[in-house]
Amino acid sequence: MKEKIISEINLDLVFQCNNFSQFSNKLKDTKTNLIFESIFWEKVFLSWINTILKNEDYELPNYIFDKKSFSLGLQIISNQEIASLNKKWMQKNGPTDVLSFPIISDESLNNLDHIELGDIFISLEMALEQSYEYKHSIYREMIWLASHGFLHLLGWEHNNEHDLENMLNFQEYLITRLD
């Protein structure tokens, strides 16, 4: 792997989280409460951007590696809201765990100093269900879903089993790199 030293990265994160007080009995520990904090997610995404930018071997658009300023949106929403987005934009019925809407689409972004990556939407209700199903914490599930959405913002797709396996492995790699 070819690793390089990078200077400071700037991230503008727009974070929104609905009121999920109905789940407060399931979200008791301090670590879990971090998922509702903008500063937590800013640190997570900055860590992932730094990890990616330090290594040019990743399959990402080349112009990403020259940038130092990024922005993205993250919204933690309900099943009802994500089902509505899923129907409108993906033509699929029902809720899903995570949706991402990348803005990066062509090389014209190459000339910009600041890159708007796009938006990630995560259903807290689906994340809770999946954390029970997979027998890990809601914190872990939210990080997993955010990493999946983030990679989609960077142009990753999983149209076949091989691509999906590579993406899931890279998600795990990013998660293990969190400070």
UniProtKB/Swiss-Prot annotation:
Q: Which GO BP terms apply? A: rRNA processing
Source species of the chain:
Prochlorococcus marinus (strain AS9601)
Swiss-Prot/TrEMBL keywords:
Cytoplasm, Endonuclease, Hydrolase, Metal-binding, Nuclease, Ribosome biogenesis, rRNA processing, Zinc
**Chief subcellular location:** cytoplasm
Binding annotation for Zn(2+) = 148, 152, 158
Cofactor annotation remark: Binds 1 zinc ion.
What does the UniProt entry say about where the protein is found?
A: Cytoplasm
Q: Check the record and name the InterPro entries matching this protein.
A: MetalPrtase_cat_dom_sf_prd (IPR023091), YbeY (IPR002036), YbeY_CS (IPR020549)
Q: Which GO terms describe its molecular function?
A: metalloendopeptidase activity; RNA endonuclease activity; zinc ion binding
Q: Which EC main class describes this enzyme? A: hydrolase
Any one cellular component term from GO for this entry?
A: cytoplasm
Q: Which cofactor does it need?
A: Zn(2+)
Which family does the record assign? Belongs to the endoribonuclease YbeY family.
Task: Tell me which Pfam families the record gives.
Answer: YbeY
The name of this protein is: Endoribonuclease YbeY
